[in-house]
Amino acid sequence: MRLVQLSRHSIAFPSPEGALREPNGLLALGGDLSPARLLMAYQRGIFPWFSPGDPILWWSPDPRAVLWPESLHISRSMKRFHKRSPYRVTMNYAFGQVIEGCASDREEGTWITRGVVEAYHRLHELGHAHSIEVWREDELVGGMYGVAQGTLFCGESMFSRMENASKTALLVFCEEFIRHGGKLIDCQILNDHTASLGACEIPRRDYLNYLNQMRLGRLPNNFWVPRCLFSPQE
């Protein structure tokens, strides 16, 4: 197994099965963040993740962290909070603000560079990347974004500026996703936060099998239309 240098003249990727074991899942470097290359990557179970100043690095870890939306773990305290939630939740109202929020709300630094922001904004304009926004009155207080692959959603990042804001985004999205035929959320790499919400690890080969099936599925044509998903009770 060796790290592959991508060409700027081809959007082809090597097989994810050739990814390194250490660091886990590192597959290739280089290329660019063009919409065509990003979409090719997601279709093959690959995603970009790199630090500012480094070359673009492409990953496909084994195992893969996923969340079955019906298995989302909501604590009793969160259920109580949500019943009296002060938040309004929307979809695709403010993609730019959400990705900027994810980029700026990381005290330890972020991989979401200006180039990444611009790349995913282009994907959003093309109808492939989507955001969930959480509002307290007219203030954006949390949200999440990711890339759609049929009935599978590749979650990229989330942020929270007020209590339970990002959890609210995920909860409301999961409910809506399930209701309209969504099957699986890709969480990429398991961490304590996603594990606490019900994410689990599965072998990469299983994830790739799910991806190949689900990316051919379809949600309703109007699913990603900008709209309000949840409003606080009066």
Swiss-Prot record:
<dbReference type="GO" id="GO:0008914">
    <property type="term" value="F:leucyl-tRNA--protein transferase activity"/>
</dbReference>
<dbReference type="InterPro" id="IPR016181">
    <property type="entry name" value="Acyl_CoA_acyltransferase"/>
</dbReference>
<comment type="function">
    <text>Functions in the N-end rule pathway of protein degradation where it conjugates Leu, Phe and, less efficiently, Met from aminoacyl-tRNAs to the N-termini of proteins containing an N-terminal arginine or lysine.</text>
</comment>
<comment type="similarity">
    <text>Belongs to the L/F-transferase family.</text>
</comment>
<dbReference type="InterPro" id="IPR004616">
    <property type="entry name" value="Leu/Phe-tRNA_Trfase"/>
</dbReference>
<dbReference type="GO" id="GO:0030163">
    <property type="term" value="P:protein catabolic process"/>
</dbReference>
<dbReference type="InterPro" id="IPR042203">
    <property type="entry name" value="Leu/Phe-tRNA_Trfase_C"/>
</dbReference>
<dbReference type="InterPro" id="IPR042221">
    <property type="entry name" value="Leu/Phe-tRNA_Trfase_N"/>
</dbReference>
<keyword id="KW-0808">Transferase</keyword>
<protein>
    <recommendedName>
        <fullName>Leucyl/phenylalanyl-tRNA--protein transferase</fullName>
        <ecNumber>2.3.2.6</ecNumber>
    </recommendedName>
</protein>
<keyword id="KW-0963">Cytoplasm</keyword>
<dbReference type="GO" id="GO:0005737">
    <property type="term" value="C:cytoplasm"/>
</dbReference>
<keyword id="KW-0012">Acyltransferase</keyword>
<dbReference type="Pfam" id="PF03588">
    <property type="entry name" value="Leu_Phe_trans"/>
</dbReference>
